[in-house]
Curated annotation (Swiss-Prot):
Belongs to the BPI/LBP/Plunc superfamily. Plunc family. Parotid glands. GO terms for cellular component: extracellular region; secretory granule. It comes from Bos taurus (Bovine). Pfam families: LBP_BPI_CETP. Disulfide bonds join C163-C206. PANTHER family: BPI FOLD-CONTAINING FAMILY A MEMBER 2 (PTHR47145:SF1). This is Short palate, lung and nasal epithelium carcinoma-associated protein 2B. The lineage of its organism: Eukaryota, Metazoa, Chordata, Craniata, Vertebrata. The gene is SPLUNC2B. It is found in: Secreted. GO terms for molecular function: lipopolysaccharide binding.
Length: 240
């Protein structure tokens, strides 16, 4: 049950009589996050870089003759993204947890190119000063880019496309609101979460994703593209 003083404060906020506290809070959150992203989130948690290097090694091993379970790569991805969001939670008060990466896929578009997708799901809780936790959300966001092999030169080169960051592609579903059906409060929470996630995608996740793919040599990328073509050809007609 919401305490009476919180309801009084809430009414003041919605009426615009409390100096637009949620707006100030939102801007302050984004300033702190921007500063953290500029410094590098691994300066707050050195484990991020360790996990990232392990992930690079694991993905490279998928291109070798060794048998490596794809699930191992996904586990490192989950560990990496979870650590990143833990730092974000400390900086912003927007708590992002229970991160899951169902898979990482290479979808061949030609013999030398593919779309690469990393779908991410997580639980989000947004807190505001004085009001505390205001809304729980379900997060779905896809990291998407392209990778190709340029064969015009003597040594084939790996070319990685832009990692898309469209805030509207970030899906946030309301699971529970501490203030019932007060839409303005829910909107504040959803919009703040969207801006935080969008900033993290642009400033941390996409650069990591790009660096991960650029670390692979042309032979490795060619093999990953070939594996995706084989998988597509083996799918039953009705499952496509």
């Amino acid at each position: 049950m919401v305490q009476l003083w919180k309801l009084v404060l809430l009414c003041g906020l919605l009426a615009g009589t409390s100096a637009s506290l949620p707006d100030i809070r939102g801007n302050d959150v984004l300033r702190k996050l921007k500063s953290g992203l500029e410094r590098g989130l691994d300066t707050f948690d050195s484990t991020i870089e360790i996990i990232f290097q392990n992930l690079k090694t694991e993905l490279e091993s998928r291109c070798s003759d060794e048998v490596v379970e794809q699930q191992e790569t996904e586990n490192f991805l989950e560990q990496l993204i979870s650590r990143i969001f833990q730092v974000v939670s400390r900086l912003t008060g927007v708590r992002i947890r229970n991160v899951q990466v169902p898979d990482i896929t290479f979808e061949a578009t030609s013999e030398n190119s593919a779309n690469v997708l990393i779908p991410i799901t997580a639980d989000v809780t947004v807190s505001l000063p004085f009001l505390g936790e205001i809304v729980d959300l379900d997060l779905n966001v896809d990291l998407q880019t392209t990778v190709s092999i340029e064969t015009d030169t003597e040594d084939p080169q790996v070319v990685v496309g832009e990692c898309t960051n469209n805030p509207e592609s970030i899906s946030l579903t309301v699971l529970h609101s501490r203030f019932g059906l007060v839409n303005d409060v829910v909107d504040i929470g959803v919009n703040l979460a969207r801006r935080v996630v969008s900033s993290v995608v642009e400033g941390e996740l996409c650069p990591r994703f790009r660096e991960l793919l650029e670390s692979l040599d042309a032979e490795c990328v060619e093999k990953l593209i070939g594996e995706s073509q084989d998988t597509t050809q083996q799918e039953p007609e009705g499952s496509r």
